[in-house]
Regions:
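Mature, function-bearing regions of proteins
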Residues: 2-178, 182-315
Length: 315
């Protein structure tokens, strides 16, 4: 599935399956097919609802200054970004893993802790992040630029001091570079592990090169244009990283927060384990996560199964 921009999001009516059932219920095979179709549409509706503007409160919806449609896109068909960002499972796993990495930076954590509704509206925060990615990846250039401008305005207001009195600002180019490098690396790692294990090194570097536009537009410096450059940014920041009580609390909120519904509970739990497994060893140790080598094949096989099932449901 590609997570389409807000103006294109639509859930196919599940009621349509009922009409199909009445026309096709004629034997065990047609019954099984009808049940499968109902299940498929139900799963699709649940997943798409998470990204649907109608499913969020008026206060937390992503607002776009313009709805003017244009064929011009930041990333045209064939872009690697469109491929990598087009899978729900890998984006969820990569997004959570990236978030766990980002929170190890005291200034990033402080910005989220002091200025965000993260602790009280985790689902809303994740939804808004997902929609920003959807708009910038698949929306028109006008929609993408409007979303970027909105985020920049928000960043300008996020300022404060750390416990030791050191000032921080969300618009700090080095912090933006850290967030971008960890996010893109995590998205790509999840894609390679669960969708395209034979992805070429050239395509992986092309992903970073394409995403460099977003980093630069948001104000990041340095702007990473290859996997190696992203790795260098992450390695250079490691001496400043800390996992304190607040980082652990945010980690618990992310990993063990309530699922949107009971159906999603087992899938969410598996996804959280996959996100922890995706972390580099040093980050896993900082968080105090165990390294379940015996469980790792089960986690990866289960996540791969979920990914394939969701692709089937959303194709």
């Amino acid at each position: 599935m590609r997570i389409q921009p807000p103006s294109d999001l639509a859930v196919a009516p599940v009621a349509r399956a009922a009409d199909d059932n009445r026309a096709t219920l004629g034997g065990p095979y047609s019954l099984a097919s009808s049940v499968a179709k109902l299940a498929k549409e139900a799963v699709a509706a649940q997943v798409i609802a998470f990204f649907d503007e109608k499913s969020s409160s008026p206060e937390t919806r992503v607002r776009h200054p313009t709805r003017v449609q244009s064929k011009e896109r930041l990333f045209p068909p064939g872009a690697v970004v469109r491929r990598v960002h087009g899978d729900v499972t890998t984006m969820m796993v990569g997004g959570i893993s990236g978030l766990l990495l980002q929170m190890l930076h005291p200034a990033v954590l402080a910005g989220v802790w002091d200025h965000s509704s993260f602790r009280t509206d985790l689902q809303g925060r994740l939804r808004r992040t997902a929609r920003f990615i959807a708009v910038t990846t698949y929306g028109s250039k006008l929609e993408a630029e409007a979303a970027i401008a909105r985020v920049r305005r928000i960043h300008e207001k996020v300022r404060g001091e750390l416990a030791d009195g050191v000032p921080y600002a969300a618009s700090d180019p080095s912090l933006l570079a850290w967030v971008h490098a960890t996010e893109t690396t995590s998205f790509l790692n999840a894609w390679v592990r669960y969708a395209e294990p034979r992805m070429s090194a050239a395509d992986q570097d092309r992903y970073f090169a394409e995403m460099a536009y977003i980093a630069g537009a948001l104000g990041a410096d340095p702007v990473t244009r290859s996997r190696r450059e992203a790795r260098d940014v992450i390695e250079a920041m490691r001496p400043r990283l800390v996992c304190d009580a607040r980082a652990r609390q945010v980690g618990r909120l992310v990993l063990y927060g309530p699922p949107p519904n009971w159906i999603a509970a087992p899938v969410q739990a598996l996804g959280m384990h996959a996100a922890m497994d995706l972390l580099p060893d040093w980050a896993r140790r900082m968080h105090g996560f165990s390294n379940p080598r015996l469980a790792r094949p089960i986690i990866r096989a289960g996540t791969l199964g979920v990914a394939r099932s969701l692709r089937w449901a959303l194709q």
